């Protein structure tokens, strides 16, 4: 069983008891069996479990818990970054919490993710005219501007050579289908807490913590997926 297949168990629209089939066992699993399996998964892989369901907007509590657990992971790894060890304990925790929050947002990002348009401050109008960046919507999608969220683009040279459309991973988004949160945005948020982290220090050192935490979320989700699969085998 995969994590995606159990999202429906958290939907309030589902009032009928759901029965699913385990991949190997001929015995059907009832809704209570699945919830018990989820409880065990949450205990064994707390970060991955909370991160996934927070990403799927199933629970705001899971989202907050994932960021809190991720911040603790960041705190344990902060000794690798001299710029962070020089901060006071309060400042260090505040900075790491900010980085963890943005790491989660980056992890949960998809082509359909919407955010307020910075050009018009979410108003849809610039100087009384329709904002050209968001077309007056006040929000912009994270979908890659080159591949439009598909993750692949036409290789024009090979297409002309072969006479049929030839696709390749989009170079702009590396095949993700969406644009990641710029690290400069995270740096500006960190500067609201402390001025001790300079742009040079951020680019050379502290920014790596952001990348580490994003990768950690993906690793932990994979571990939660594997754990659930073993439990429901």
Language-model features: locations:
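N-terminal alpha-helical interaction blocks
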Residues: 1-115
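Charged/polar, solvent-exposed surface patches and flexible loops
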Residues: 8-9, 51-54, 97, 102, ...
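Generic secondary-structure boundary signal with a strong preference for alpha-helix termini
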Residues: 51, 60, 161, 187-189
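Short, surface-exposed, charged/polar-biased interaction segments
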Residues: 73, 152-155, 165-168, 191-194, ...
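Short glycine-rich, low-complexity/disordered patches
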Residues: 84-86, 109-120, 219-232
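Cys/His-rich short segments
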Residues: 111-180
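Alpha-helical oligomerization segments
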Residues: 170, 181-233
């Amino acid at each position: 069983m995969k994590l995606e297949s159990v999202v429906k168990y958290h939907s309030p629209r589902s009032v009928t008891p759901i029965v699913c089939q385990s991949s190997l066992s001929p015995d059907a699993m009832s809704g209570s069996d699945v919830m018990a399996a989820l409880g065990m998964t949450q205990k064994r892989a707390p970060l991955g479990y909370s991160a996934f369901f927070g990403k799927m907007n199933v629970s705001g509590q899971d989202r907050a818990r994932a960021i809190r657990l991720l911040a603790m992971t960041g705190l344990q790894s902060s000794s690798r970054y001299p710029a962070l060890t020089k901060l006071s304990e309060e400042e260090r925790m505040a900075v790491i919490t900010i980085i963890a929050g943005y790491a989660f947002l980056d992890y949960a990002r998809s082509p359909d993710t919407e955010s307020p348009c910075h050009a018009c401050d979410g108003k849809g109008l610039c100087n009384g005219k329709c904002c050209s960046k968001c077309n007056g919507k006040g929000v912009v999608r994270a979908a890659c501007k080159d591949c439009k969220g598909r993750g692949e683009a036409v290789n024009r040279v090979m297409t002309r050579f072969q006479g049929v459309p030839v696709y390749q991973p989009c170079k702009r988004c590396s095949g993700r289908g969406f644009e990641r949160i710029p690290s400069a945005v995270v740096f500006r948020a960190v500067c609201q807490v402390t001025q001790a982290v300079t742009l040079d220090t951020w680019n050379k050192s502290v920014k790596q913590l952001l990348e580490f935490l994003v990768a950690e979320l993906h690793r932990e989700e994979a571990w939660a997926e594997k754990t659930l699969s073993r439990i429901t085998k």
